Amino acid sequence: MTDLDSSLPPSVRTAGDSWTITELVGATALGVAAARAAETAGPDPLIRDEFAGLLVSSASPAWARLADPELSWLDDDPHGKRAHRVGIDYQAVRTHYFDEYFDGALRAGIRQVVILAAGLDSRAYRLNWPAGTTVYEIDQPKVLEYKTETLQRHGATPAAVRRPVPVDLRDDWPAALTAAGFQAARPTAWLAEGLLPYLPSDAQDRLFEMVTALSAAGSQVAVEVFGMNSRSNAQRWLRMRERLGLDVNVAALTYHEPDRSDAAAWLARHGWRVHSVDNRDEMARLGRPVPEDLSDEAVRSTLLRAHLGGSTG
């Protein structure tokens, strides 16, 4: 169960809602990609995502400005610039964490990957996948279409067999995944990055139930679990709205439900061996510590990996 911030606005989400890349939840994928683009273009980058900038700049000039590694749109706001830089650091660290997760899964012999709510994730294009690896990307149809068409237009080709699965995770996504060629008898590496707050609590439980049901022994899953009482996203997006005209209220796009299951505890109860790390500990480990005076504005989350039977890799 998660503590909720009583100042959070009510969710504007509705059953069956959908979006393009610049609308609702789709726009959050652009914000995350902009952070990866800024990190990649900056000095001594922790991760390299050469496709993020293409995906962001193709959306609009305002989104392209957001990806500026110098954060020139915040030149007259030193505090806002420092706080936004910490947000970019967080995105870089979580990307690094999940990149390492996939490296470990591949070393363990897994060749079937499912990215849940893939958004503008470009791992199918940028990671060094062994021959025979298939990457399934599940997300809203228009979001996947935007990514595919944009990268094709720039001549990018996947580094693995990439199979988009256009379906809402609140619907019967296992059927769509199976229809795309997924084989439940093979070990799978699953990823749920930046996803859980955008699902109702019952849909989160169903998601984990289906992931478990579809996972052969030796499968792995990685999950990002947010602290729902953090105001960091709201403040970050407020600056973006005021400075760049990007009208996205992330807090209103998430589900604020006090009875949401604890992901690590749920997985442990259902046969997964879980290892987790506090995002701030991981940021410090990788040389991107959160400054003490910005602690209240920085993201709080848990990054976890879990294994189902078989080798832990």
Curated annotation (Swiss-Prot):
Pfam families, per database record: LCM
Enzyme class: transferase
Binding site for S-adenosyl-L-methionine: D139, D168, L169
Keywords: Methyltransferase, S-adenosyl-L-methionine, Transferase
InterPro entries per UniProt: Ppm1/Ppm2/Tcmp (IPR007213), SAM-dependent_MTases_sf (IPR029063), SAM_mthyl_Trfase_ML2640-like (IPR011610)
Entry annotated with the keyword NAD: no
Gene Ontology molecular function terms on file: methyltransferase activity
EC number assigned by the record: 2.1.1.-
Protein name: Putative S-adenosyl-L-methionine-dependent methyltransferase MAP_3563
Organism: Mycolicibacterium paratuberculosis (strain ATCC BAA-968 / K-10)
Organism ancestry: Bacteria, Bacillati, Actinomycetota, Actinomycetes, Mycobacteriales
